[in-house]
């Protein structure tokens, strides 16, 4: 059926009036499309391209800012780790110094206590020796006076006690 239509059109010849009408209509339609559709479409495409370009630029700037923030954060983290390490080191040094001070102070206190104890012991020993010396002197006098049956004078008594104490001192030294 299509073939008969085409054959009939060719047999009659070309209708130049219709052909020109179609071409003029096509050109008018093309001008209208260009004026009302093509220009707004190209404007819209240009705006879209500009927006995409701006979005890409904004994304690049945001990426750069993010990288800068990451670098700043890494630097701050590194600095805080360094500061923490320094604080720990200082605390350790202070602790060691306090430990040494405490040990030194305790050692000095022990030495002082030992010295005081030695002084006290020496003083007590001397007091005990003096007391024993007096007791021995009194006992010696009593014994001597009973043996001799006479009273010794104070000088005789003192000489007797001194000689007795010297004898005791020599006995203690030999031990």
UniProtKB/Swiss-Prot annotation:
GO terms for cellular component: plasma membrane; proton-transporting ATP synthase complex. Keywords: ATP synthesis, Cell membrane, CF(0), Hydrogen ion transport, Ion transport, Membrane, Transmembrane, Transmembrane helix, Transport. Its main location: membrane. InterPro entries: ATP_synth_B-like_membr_sf (IPR028987), ATP_synth_b/b'su_bac/chlpt (IPR002146), ATP_synth_F0_bsu_bac (IPR005864), ATP_synthase_B_chain (IPR050059). This is ATP synthase subunit b. F(1)F(0) ATP synthase produces ATP from ADP in the presence of a proton or sodium gradient. F-type ATPases consist of two structural domains, F(1) containing the extramembraneous catalytic core and F(0) containing the membrane proton channel, linked together by a central stalk and a peripheral stalk. During catalysis, ATP synthesis in the catalytic domain of F(1) is coupled via a rotary mechanism of the central stalk subunits to proton translocation. Component of the F(0) channel, it forms part of the peripheral stalk, linking F(1) to F(0). F-type ATPases have 2 components, F(1) - the catalytic core - and F(0) - the membrane proton channel. F(1) has five subunits: alpha(3), beta(3), gamma(1), delta(1), epsilon(1). F(0) has three main subunits: a(1), b(2) and c(10-14). The alpha and beta chains form an alternating ring which encloses part of the gamma chain. F(1) is attached to F(0) by a central stalk formed by the gamma and epsilon chains, while a peripheral stalk is formed by the delta and b chains. It holds the Pfam family ATP-synt_B.
């Amino acid at each position: 059926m299509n073939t008969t239509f085409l054959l009939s059109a060719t047999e009659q010849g070309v209708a130049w009036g219709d052909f020109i009408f179609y071409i003029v209509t096509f050109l008018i339609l093309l001008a209208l499309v260009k004026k009302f559709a093509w220009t707004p479409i190209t404007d819209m495409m240009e705006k879209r391209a500009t927006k995409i370009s701006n979005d890409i630029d904004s994304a690049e700037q945001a990426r750069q800012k993010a990288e800068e923030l990451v670098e700043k954060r890494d630097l701050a983290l590194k600095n805080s780790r360094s500061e923490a390490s320094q604080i720990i080191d200082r605390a350790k040094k202070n602790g060691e110094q306090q430990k040494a001070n405490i040990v030194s102070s305790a050692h000095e206190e022990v030495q002082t206590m030992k010295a005081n104890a030695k002084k006290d012991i020496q003083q007590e020993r001397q007091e005990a020796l003096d007391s024993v010396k007096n007791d021995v002197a009194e006992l010696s006098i009593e014994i001597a006076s009973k043996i001799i049956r006479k009273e010794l004078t104070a000088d005789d008594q003192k000489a007797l006690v001194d000689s007795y104490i010297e004898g005791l001192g020599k006995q203690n030294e030999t031990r």
